[in-house]
Regions:
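Residues that define the transmembrane beta-barrel architecture of outer-membrane proteins
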Residues: 38-40, 67-73, 78, 101-105, ...
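Residues on the lipid-exposed face of transmembrane beta-strands in outer-membrane beta-barrel proteins
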Residues: 44, 73-79, 107-113, 154-160, ...
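Transmembrane beta-barrel strands of outer-membrane/channel proteins
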Residues: 42-50, 77, 86-90, 111, ...
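Extracellular loop and loop/strand-boundary signature of outer-membrane beta-barrel proteins
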Residues: 58-63, 91-95, 104, 137-145, ...
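Outer-membrane pore/translocation modules
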Residues: 29, 108-216
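Outer-envelope beta-barrel architecture signal
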Residues: 36-42, 71, 80-82, 114-118, ...
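Predominantly the C-terminal beta-signal and adjacent terminal strand-loop region
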Residues: 269-302
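Surface-exposed strand-loop-strand hairpins of Gram-negative outer-membrane beta-barrel proteins
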Residues: 49-72, 83-99
Length: 302
């Protein structure tokens, strides 16, 4: 692991950023980070978010289930400790989306207080497909409007050098990183989710009887550690990277059967990168976030 055309917009991306440590004193190092609380920032952006399910079968084939999401067009603003971004998929950016499939909702909050990294996920996808590139016996995508995925998660980390390294500067430009800085961090994460269809999920024409399933539930929790850093160059350009690895105690159940469940330890990782240019009047950047969640292996299920 991981619409019927209507006139009301579908909100698929929402971020609310605030500093929850109101009662604590945390001073930034002004030699490294410039705080700009008086500025009101307005942004226009493109985004693409999705949660895939990747199933590896006993004979070595790989099937990738992809949701009926798409390319989003959005607007947002930042003022002091509040950031709000709203976006939706628009038709001219998504000519291949299934227009009559159910609505979906993908809520992600990426919070960067001055010495913390917090990620919250609430994903509710309806309708998945397997592209033809992942099918051995078909030249057309395999469409399943009935497949539903639900995923909830929390990732929390403490940034040791938060007074010199601001991830807010890379993410929403409410701060400006003036000099390069780096920091290790430690924390924990917890995730739970399910995927279910009205019948077996893999197509019958693929002949994967032993590795086929109609539902899956999973849960995992464990500690993680990582490293973050920003390199500043060229009078305002920056390159930020954040990577963490995790070992989680995990549980997976297939086909709602107590005979097909398993506890185990699984490795996961979280990768994000930011590149752009920041100033008090203008900012442009590109962001990439990838969260990998593994399931416990069980016989023919991987």
């Amino acid at each position: 692991m991981a619409f019927r055309r209507i006139f009301l917009p579908l909100i698929v991306f929402s971020i609310l950023v605030f500093d929850p440590i109101y009662g604590q004193k945390f001073e930034l190092d002004s030699n490294y980070v410039e705080e700009t609380p008086e500025l009101f920032s307005l942004r226009f952006y493109f985004s693409k978010k999705y949660t895939d399910l990747i199933q590896k079968t006993a004979d070595g084939n790989t099937y990738r289930f992809q949701p009926n999401s798409g390319n989003n067009l959005g607007i947002g603003f930042t003022y002091q400790k509040l950031t709000l971004n709203l976006a939706m998929p628009v038709g001219f950016l998504n000519p291949d989306r299934q227009q009559d499939w159910p609505l979906y909702l993908d809520l992600q909050a990426h919070l960067y207080p001055k010495n913390m990294i917090i990620d919250v996920f609430g994903q509710f996808y309806n309708g998945y497909s397997i592209p033809s590139d992942f099918l051995s016996n078909s030249d057309s995508p395999y469409l399943r409007e009935d497949i539903k995925l639900r995923k909830l998660g929390l990732n929390f980390n403490y940034l040791f050098n938060g007074e010199q390294l601001s991830l807010m500067a890379a993410f929403n430009q409410s701060f400006i990183q003036k000099r390069s800085a780096f920091s290790p961090f430690v924390g924990f994460e917890v995730y739970g989710g399910s995927i279910k269809g009205d019948s077996l999920l893999l197509p019958a024409f693929e002949n994967q009887r032993e590795s086929n399933f109609s539902s899956n539930r999973s849960f995992q929790v464990g500690p993680n550690a990582g490293f973050a850093g920003t390199v500043v160059f060229g009078g305002g350009f920056f390159l930020t990277g954040v990577f963490s690895g995790n070992l989680s105690l995990a549980y997976t159940q297939w086909n709602e059967s107590s005979d097909l469940d398993q506890w185990g330890i699984v490795p996961t990782y979280f990768l994000r990168g930011f590149f752009g240019y920041n100033s008090r009047k203008f900012s442009i950047n590109a962001n990439y976030v990838l969260k990998n969640n593994q399931m416990v292996r069980l016989d023919n299920f991987d």
